[in-house]
Amino acid sequence: MASEAVKVVVRCRPMNQRERELRCQPVVTVDCARAQCCIQNPGAADEPPKQFTFDGAYHVDHVTEQIYNEIAYPLVEGVTEGYNGTIFAYGQTGSGKSFTMQGLPDPPSQRGIIPRAFEHVFESVQCAENTKFLVRASYLEIYNEDVRDLLGADTKQKLELKEHPEKGVYVKGLSMHTVHSVAQCEHIMETGWKNRSVGYTLMNKDSSRSHSIFTISIEMSAVDERGKDHLRAGKLNLVDLAGSERQSKTGATGERLKEATKINLSLSALGNVISALVDGRCKHVPYRDSKLTRLLQDSLGGNTKTLMVACLSPADNNYDETLSTLRYANRAKNIRNKPRINEDPKDALLREYQEEIKKLKAILTQQMSPSSLSALLSRQVPPDPVQVEEKLLPQPVIQHDVEAEKQLIREEYEERLARLKADYKAEQESRARLEEDITAMRNSYDVRLSTLEENLRKETEAVLQVGVLYKAEVMSRAEFASSAEYPPAFQYETVVKPKVFSTTDTLPSDDVSKTQVSSRFAELPKVEPSKSEISLGSSESSSLEETSVSEAFPGPEEPSNVEVSMPTEESRSRYFLDECLGQEAAGHLLGEQNYLPQEEPQEVPLQGLLGLQDPFAEVEAKLARLSSTVARTDAPQADVPKVPVQVPAPTDLLEPSDARPEAEAADDFPPRPEVDLASEVALEVVRTAEPGVWLEAQAPVALVAQPEPLPATAGVKRESVGMEVAVLTDDPLPVVDQQQVLARLQLLEQQVVGGEQAKNKDLKEKHKRRKRYADERRKQLVAALQNSDEDSGDWVLLNVYDSIQEEVRAKSKLLEKMQRKLRAAEVEIKDLQSEFQLEKIDYLATIRRQERDSMLLQQLLEQVQPLIRRDCNYSNLEKILRESCWDEDNGFWKIPHPVITKTSLPVAVSTGPQNKPARKTSAADNGEPNMEDDRYRLMLSRSNSENIASNYFRSKRASQILSTDARKSLTHHNSPPGLSCPLSNNSAIPPTQAPEMPQPRPFRLESLDIPFTKAKRKKSKSNFGSEPL
């Protein structure tokens, strides 16, 4: 992996009003062509100036625009390509760090690096082709080693630093705001700048008291030539550091002094990190010494392109700070980073947005066509940037009114929660009512359908006569067919024209013309009725074509041809072919791709049919009345492609007027509900009219067409011959709120930007021109440095001198130049040694001070340790030291908590009552022993051991009472053997006497021997002989 050094530039500001009042002299000189900076020691004018070379050097007359175009532009351009970048300003307080990073809005040339980075990022985003970007911004500060979110609801809340194996170090709970334009980024920057901690010092009236980091996170999705997405992510950190301070110059006291101490500690940790990275022998880099160095861990020696802007003060009053800044910057040049493109990050939010957009578009595409969806999305007006900013950014929190703001947020949350609950409850109630209405409609539909079927069974009894006559004529056909010389008495010619019940997904079908009904019918006298047209009952169901029925009846004596033109519709399954035509006819039809062959019409005997009444007219009229009710019970669904099947029906043998109401009713109804009703009606007709055919069709029905279970809104539709049957098998679409889905889709698409100015040639040319300028400036700097090296090289040796004197003069000039360099090197070594000596003295003083503090703490510990209770765990300090451990993240020791172990000694004599020892151990348990009680017990124990007479003449009863006390019995055991004899005899008391012992009296009453002298004497006389001397 290729590595690159940290780029370092220096910028020297003009003198401010304070320095001019102090009549300070400039000590810094800058050579912009060679990127060199020199500083002269004001205390040693004879010494040569110290010279430093960087990647860029800018003096007082240079503006921020030039700095950005020459140095910062390539780094920010790399961020839009997937690299990580960091730009941070370093220097003492009042040196112009915030001016370099933030800048001034007027004049435009002095705008800071941060707002220029905004313009650059969105310029690259808008010019990109086939790439979408998700740009987010965050703003934080480090104040007194506490991380705060400058864009959060509570800017004073402390945030924690976490570390992830893939993301690295990050701030937990930091708010990220999606931005779409430069205006939104500037608004975020201004909001965070107002919340930043600033203070007044003698060197700067608006001194930054914290380090701030503005982060721009970019996620990009590029589409290659193959149409595959490539996801990359880049991050740009714009760091404005607080300046190092000297208390003698800033006059910081109190809170300002505490802030200055924290600032100097963090900057010192940053310097240590830089020194450790430059020194190749150092194995440990102290990133954890400060939160600033932890957040910049990836920027210093990691996967980041880094630019350091060292800000200088030209005044001689700040010579030491300026020299220290130059040394730090010169050291940072040698840091090597290893930047790489962040490809396919696992936690990319842009990938989640793209997947959600695809899902939402799929949902909307099911409800509307893609063209209408794209038109609807294109008509949407993007929201006003100001309104978007107000939604993205919280309002600044007023410090003195935090509680009121919290209360307002709480009330708003409760109001939203109540509104959501009310909406949910109303939706549930509406759903319940809708289910009740659907159930009622279905019940009404079932009742009416059952009533209609019952009426049809009664009305179709007349059709039985038609079936009987039809069978009789079929059986007599053989007799008439054998005699060819007999002319037909009646000829019936049927012309069947196919009709298609069209839906949105209906497949195209071929036209089928005249169909032969049967080849076995005999010729009959021709009857020609009057012509009529089948009119459509509804303009909406215009899929059935109008057909004309032409029938000629010249007279009862002369036969004529009867042509009937009626619609025959598609059938949905073979089930109905077998059901209506029989097994043989259905098999014949299915074998020829479900179409009947075109043949000449045959003459059909139709004697006796002209006088029959039409039983279908009344039925179809009732079906038409139910159309509106049935249409509400079924939800609309998309139709599937259907294959039309043309079949003849027994109703073709009826009068032409008999078929008209059926066609009209089928055309009037919506596609699904009427087919449900009409199929049931026609099936009952076929069952009744043709019992023989129906019985023959039962076997093939079970084998050919087994209906599959479908949802309640779609089922197998059975229809009579001559009508089209459609089977709906599509699943119902998910019920979604189209407006909510559309609003979410628009919101997600607005989050993603990119390619808005892809066709703008002027903007692209400007973008390329600025990139070329940065490359040319870098080449010029490299050439200037090479020329500088040649000046100090051996080019002089190539000259040819005309005389010895000319050569001596040239050699003298070269020697003077080398002597100046030698003198500068000696001064530099002396300065480094002096700095090292000062640091060594400082380190030794710190070590001595820490040793004195350690000795003080050790002496205090030796004095305090004997006072610690023995039942406390801190009485054993060695164990506490073994259990303690250092917390690297928080920077303090984790020590055990103090614990007091409550212990009580067991009772020595088990025959006495337990209430008295419990009372005595309670004081010890509480940790507060009664010192007066202890002294009184000690006095009693001494009197017992010294007063021989009292011990000798002591009664048994008193000794029994005293023996119940464990501590008193222990004191008697410690007495001399001769004096403990009276008490030792009490231990020989039989166990039977133990329950008869009296209750013990209070301890203090034992010393009063006056009331019990007589009793003691009597008992002593009785036991005098038994007691040993």
From Swiss-Prot:
Keywords, ordered alphabetically: ATP-binding, Cell projection, Coiled coil, Cytoplasm, Cytoskeleton, Microtubule, Motor protein, Nucleotide-binding, Protein transport, Transport
SMART domains, sorted: KISc (SM00129)
Basic and acidic residues: compositionally biased ranges: 657-673
InterPro entries xref list: Kinesin-like_fam, Kinesin_motor_CS, Kinesin_motor_dom, Kinesin_motor_dom_sf, P-loop_NTPase
Binding site for ATP: G91, Q92, T93, G94, S95, G96, K97, S98
Coiled-coil ranges from the UniProt annotation: 346-462, 739-846
Alphabetical list of Pfam families matching this protein: Kinesin (PF00225)
Biased composition, class Low complexity, residue ranges: 532-551
Biological processes per GO annotation: anterograde dendritic transport of neurotransmitter receptor complex; cell projection organization; protein transport; vesicle-mediated transport
Domain of life (superkingdom): Eukaryota
Localization: Cytoplasm, Cytoskeleton; Cell projection, Cilium; Cell projection, Dendrite
One MF annotation (Gene Ontology) recorded for this entry: ATP hydrolysis activity
One of the record's GO cellular component terms: cytosol
Domain Kinesin motor, chain residue ranges per copy: 5-335
Start and end residues of each stretch annotated as Disordered: 523-569, 647-673, 908-931, 968-1029
Assembly behavior: Homodimer. Interacts with APBA1 (via PDZ domain); the interaction is direct and is required for association of KIF17 with the cargo that is to be transported. Interacts with IFT B complex components IFT52 and IFT57. Interacts with IFT70B. Interacts with PIWIL1. Interacts with TBATA.
Family membership: Belongs to the TRAFAC class myosin-kinesin ATPase superfamily. Kinesin family.
Role noted for this protein: Dendrite-specific motor protein which, in association with the Apba1-containing complex (LIN-10-LIN-2-LIN-7 complex), transports vesicles containing N-methyl-D-aspartate (NMDA) receptor subunit NR2B along microtubules.
Protein name: Kinesin-like protein KIF17
Lineage: Eukaryota, Metazoa, Chordata, Craniata, Vertebrata
Gene of this entry: KIF17
